[in-house]
């Protein structure tokens, strides 16, 4: 009843206490490509499913390096994500210049969440239509955070966002207790398994072209693994499938 009256203004609440533009931005995140994040004591891993606009087009980049100790996976509008990524890079660079040390991951996430929030309150702006999964490592250990267009952010042991992310969450909820002691290779394998759950068609599979992996941890600067470099992890996933079938 009230939706048409209030869904074009970011500064006005509807009578039911909702801001529809924020809900639309959240929907953009839900419709984006799936991304999974998980961590152990020493490492944090991002795994993302890349999409291609057509058979003639290349796959869109979904994981970005922010600094040596932190990176992001995105779901939603890539252009908005690029703006936020540049903002995060500038914040890390400025902090490093002033303090000659790396910014703590939580502080960086708080800053980008505040930037999200400004666009939910000021007239003439729209919310960023993108959700971020932030993976980082600092003196406090490995971290996984999720940011939302609403300006909220959350700390997780493991999480997934994007299209059909609930299937990946179900896998993560069943196995997250074992993640803490996992090696980097095992953590990546769990991430790929969770991401595989988001693929609806049995004819589609994870391959080196549509998968992107980001890793960071103790003694490991943030690194993106794609194309041929990702194939060994996909091979490991395929080799473990018959074992799963036998144990079931």
From Swiss-Prot:
CDD domains: proteasome_alpha_type_1. Coiled coil: none annotated. Pfam families: Proteasome (PF00227), Proteasome_A_N (PF10584). The keyword Flavoprotein does not apply. One of its GO terms (cellular component) is nucleus. Its main location: cytoplasm. GO terms for biological process: proteasomal protein catabolic process; proteasome-mediated ubiquitin-dependent protein catabolic process; ubiquitin-dependent protein catabolic process. The keyword Magnesium does not apply. Keywords: Cytoplasm, Nucleus, Proteasome. Gene3D superfamilies: Glutamine Phosphoribosylpyrophosphate, subunit 1, domain 1 (3.60.20.10). InterPro entries: Ntn_hydrolases_N, Proteasome_alpha, Proteasome_alpha-type, Proteasome_alpha1, Proteasome_asu_N, Proteasome_sua/b. It is found in: Cytoplasm; Nucleus. Disulfide bonds: none annotated. The 26S proteasome consists of a 20S proteasome core and two 19S regulatory subunits. The 20S proteasome core is composed of 28 subunits that are arranged in four stacked rings, resulting in a barrel-shaped structure. The two end rings are each formed by seven alpha subunits, and the two central rings are each formed by seven beta subunits. The catalytic chamber with the active sites is on the inside of the barrel. Belongs to the peptidase T1A family. PANTHER family: PROTEASOME SUBUNIT ALPHA/BETA. The proteasome is a multicatalytic proteinase complex which is characterized by its ability to cleave peptides with Arg, Phe, Tyr, Leu, and Glu adjacent to the leaving group at neutral or slightly basic pH. The proteasome has an ATP-dependent proteolytic activity. This is Proteasome subunit alpha type-1. It comes from Dictyostelium discoideum.
């Amino acid at each position: 009843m009230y939706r048409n009256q209030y869904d074009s203004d970011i500064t006005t609440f509807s009578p039911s206490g909702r801001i529809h533009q924020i809900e639309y931005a959240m929907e953009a995140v839900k419709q984006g490509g799936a991304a999974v994040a998980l961590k152990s004591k020493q490492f944090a891993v991002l795994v993302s499913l890349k999409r291609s606009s057509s058979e003639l087009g290349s796959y869109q980049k979904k994981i970005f390096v922010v600094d040596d100790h932190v990176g992001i996976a995105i779901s939603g509008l890539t252009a908005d994500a690029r703006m936020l990524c540049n903002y995060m890079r500038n914040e890390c660079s400025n902090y490093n210049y002033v303090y000659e040390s790396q910014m703590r991951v939580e502080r960086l996430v708080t800053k980008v969440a505040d930037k999200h929030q400004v666009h939910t309150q000021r007239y003439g702006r729209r919310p960023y239509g993108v959700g971020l999964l932030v993976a980082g490592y600092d003196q406090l250990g490995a971290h996984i955070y999720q940011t939302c267009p609403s300006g909220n952010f959350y700390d997780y042991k493991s999480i997934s966002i994007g299209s059909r992310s609930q299937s990946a969450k179900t896998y993560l909820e069943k196995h997250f207790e074992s993640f803490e002691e996992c090696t980097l290779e095992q953590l990546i394998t769990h991430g790929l398994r969770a991401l595989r759950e988001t693929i609806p068609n049995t004819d589609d599979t994870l391959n080196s072209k549509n998968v992107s992996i980001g890793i960071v941890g103790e003694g490991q600067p943030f690194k993106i693994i794609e194309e041929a470099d990702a194939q060994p992890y996909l091979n490991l996933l395929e080799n473990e499938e018959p074992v799963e079938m036998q144990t079931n």
